[in-house]
């Protein structure tokens, strides 16, 4: 077919949400010429749902994106109105940072970054078609019939693909926040042979701040102790003048209003057909599923410093507007609240992710990548994590360099992508700490130690950032060695000091590291015996040292498991394998292998429905094939 390309790019990214901006920034910073196309330029990196970044598991993803050289962490650190460390009373594996965002300022700040990025063109246009020749991407066609050439295309359309907003019995074509839906592109993806699913998400009503009675709600302040998402942010820039959130609850009257109107709820009348998120259900779904609960938490979250809009977190709904108004007014503190926006549900098309490789390239079409909600995930952070990986791998593919695949032991991003491509998802996927088997080594405090070197190798970590990282790493390594080299002996003077500090006396000589391993002993306690490090260590390095030492036994066991899985991941499965040629594997395993086409024994072992016996049979089969190939090669010599 003959195309009339008016412009040529290395990579075209369709959609400028949180996945799209990370993908386009990563690829352009790696030297590729990139076009970032969006239906509405005013909605770049917009937050159509909750005005926050981070949270359990998600906050760690933001730090991983930052460690790789992404932008989300830097932008939220410039635009937050509140910062809070979650789960501080629990172990280090589940601690995570969460920020309330000034959503308008966040979008503006990210747009400024995109507009000033070399090699990156931002354009408001609607892409209707991805152009493919001989199984390879060659470009795109817009709604205005312009054709742009590209060596790779990344689809990051969020909830816009055949999007439909639902409020009561009203249902109309729309993307998020009442933007245009992308209909023709949704049709095109089907025509290209991709399997498409239909998901649903929702958002709560927004109420006017000045109409809320805060006196009867519970204040939720931010942290005074400085914390940041980005490793480049400085404590002296930490915002002290933070905006609080407020806690209230549903009650018996609220539940009665919902129960009396279930016959008008799209969730229960059949109007909503898409599958909704398990871990962020609508309020009507919660009332039905958890009928024994007397109340549900609601957080009143300001959407910025210069707006009256307040997001009612926990009240996501698609009930009719009049019911929503009664529901809002039944809640303590919101009796006279003015509803500024109505809550709604949105249904949208998504690409079933078992069709993707771990690079986020589709198996069917070379050069076509997908990321974010297009792949069936929920959340800005999950989108950003996929976006940077898709952008990196699209650039590496074009440049003829080895691909980047994050393993489950590398980060939560690796866990998420492996879950998607290996297990698929039948509902909007949300990251949870429980999804990570190595969560003690995938912590909030060590994301830079895990991923900065990768970011440097692919060209996303600049010299200044790398120099700062090397200083931190050297300080950490040197102090760990020092603690392991200095001994505390059970002599009278030492034990007198130990007992004075309230600790059990020493019975044997121990290293400073072994002494610190005691649960009740802090790093500062150890320093009282051995003196400070040669260089001043900041609190974040001290926290990292304490965690690594106190949990060393558990971390060591996790690393042993990682080593075993690495051996499994190194055993490749040929792309052209004939699954029907393998005798004795279970029917379910054969079906799953055909569907997913795992690339390694490790990936095959994680497919649901595949048991250890199937893996053993597969390994015997591959070993037999390898011996057969070796014999053939020897005969031909």
Swiss-Prot record:
GO terms for molecular function: flavin adenine dinucleotide binding. FAD binds at residues 15-20, 127, 182, 373. Keywords: Cytoplasm, FAD, Flavoprotein, NAD, tRNA processing. Its cofactor is FAD. GO terms for biological process: tRNA methylation; tRNA wobble uridine modification. NAD(+) binds at residues 276-290. It comes from the Bacteria. Coiled coil: none annotated. It is found in: Cytoplasm. GO terms for cellular component: cytosol. Belongs to the MnmG family. Homodimer. Heterotetramer of two MnmE and two MnmG subunits. NAD-binding protein involved in the addition of a carboxymethylaminomethyl (cmnm) group at the wobble position (U34) of certain tRNAs, forming tRNA-cmnm(5)s(2)U34. This is tRNA uridine 5-carboxymethylaminomethyl modification enzyme MnmG. It comes from Streptococcus pneumoniae serotype 4 (strain ATCC BAA-334 / TIGR4).
């Amino acid at each position: 077919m003959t195309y009339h390309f008016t412009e040529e790019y290395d990579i075209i990214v369709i959609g400028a949400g949180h996945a799209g901006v990370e993908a386009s920034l990563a690829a352009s910073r790696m030297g590729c010429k990139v076009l970032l196309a969006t239906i509405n330029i005013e909605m770049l990196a917009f937050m159509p749902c909750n005005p926050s970044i981070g949270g359990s598991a998600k906050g760690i993803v933001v730090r991983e994106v930052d460690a790789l050289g992404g932008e989300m962490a830097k932008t939220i650190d410039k635009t937050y109105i509140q910062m809070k460390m979650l789960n501080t009373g629990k172990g280090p594996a589940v601690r995570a940072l969460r920020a309330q965002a000034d959503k308008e300022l966040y979008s503006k700040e990210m747009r400024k970054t995109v507009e000033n990025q070399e090699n990156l063109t931002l354009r408001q246009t609607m892409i209707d078609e991805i152009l493919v020749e001989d199984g390879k991407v060659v470009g795109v066609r817009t709604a205005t019939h312009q054709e742009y050439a590209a060596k790779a295309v990344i689809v990051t359309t969020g909830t816009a693909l055949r999007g439909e907003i639902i409020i009561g019995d009203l249902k109309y074509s729309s993307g998020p926040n009442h933007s245009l839906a992308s209909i023709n592109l949704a049709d095109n993806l089907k025509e290209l042979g991709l399997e498409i699913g239909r998901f649903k998400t929702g958002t709560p009503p927004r109420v006017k701040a000045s109409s809320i009675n805060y006196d009867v709600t519970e204040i939720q302040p931010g942290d005074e102790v400085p914390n940041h998402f980005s490793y480049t942010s400085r404590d002296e820039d930490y915002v002290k003048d933070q905006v609080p959130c407020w806690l209230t609850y549903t009650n018996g009257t609220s539940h009665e209003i919902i129960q009396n109107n279930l016959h008008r709820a799209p969730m229960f009348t059949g109007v909503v057909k898409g599958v909704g998120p398990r871990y962020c259900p609508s309020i009507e779904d919660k009332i039905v599923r958890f009928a024994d609960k007397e109340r549900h938490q609601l957080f009143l979250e300001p959407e910025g410093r210069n707006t009256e809009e307040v997001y009612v977190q926990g009240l996501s709904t698609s009930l009719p507007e009049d019911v929503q108004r009664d529901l809002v007014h039944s809640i303590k503190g919101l009796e006279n609240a003015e509803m500024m926006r109505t809550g709604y549900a949105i249904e949208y098309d998504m690409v079933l992710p078992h069709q993707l490789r771990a690079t986020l390239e589709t198996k069917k079409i070379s050069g076509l990548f997908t990321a974010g909600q297009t792949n069936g995930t929920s959340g800005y952070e999950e989108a950003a994590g996929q976006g940077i990986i898709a952008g990196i791998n699209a650039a590496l593919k074009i440049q003829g360099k080895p691909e980047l695949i994050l393993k489950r032991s590398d980060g939560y991003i690796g866990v998420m992508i492996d879950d998607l491509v290996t297990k698929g998802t039948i509902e909007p996927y949300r990251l949870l700490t429980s999804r990570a088997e190595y969560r003690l080594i995938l912590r909030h405090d060590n994301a830079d130690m895990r991923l900065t070197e990768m970011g440097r190798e692919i060209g996303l970590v600049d010299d200044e950032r790398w120099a700062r990282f090397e200083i931190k790493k050297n300080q950490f390594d040197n102090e760990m060695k020092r603690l392991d080299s200095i001994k505390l002996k059970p002599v009278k003077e030492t034990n007198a000091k130990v007992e004075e500090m309230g600790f059990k006396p020493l019975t044997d000589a121990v290293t400073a590291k072994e002494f610190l391993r005691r649960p009740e002993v802090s790093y500062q306690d150890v320093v009282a015996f051995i003196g400070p490090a040669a260089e001043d260590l900041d609190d974040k390095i001290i926290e990292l040292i304490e965690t690594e030492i106190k949990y060393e036994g558990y971390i060591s066991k996790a690393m042993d498991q990682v080593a075993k899985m690495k051996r499994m991941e190194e055993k490749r499965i040929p792309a052209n394998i004939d699954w029907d040629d393998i005798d004795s594997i279970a029917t379910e395993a054969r079906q799953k292998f055909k569907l997913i086409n795992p690339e390694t024994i490790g990936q095959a072992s994680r497919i649901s429905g595949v048991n250890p016996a199937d893996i053993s049979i597969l390994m015997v089969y591959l070993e037999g094939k390898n011996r057969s190939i070796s014999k053939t090669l020897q005969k031909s010599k």
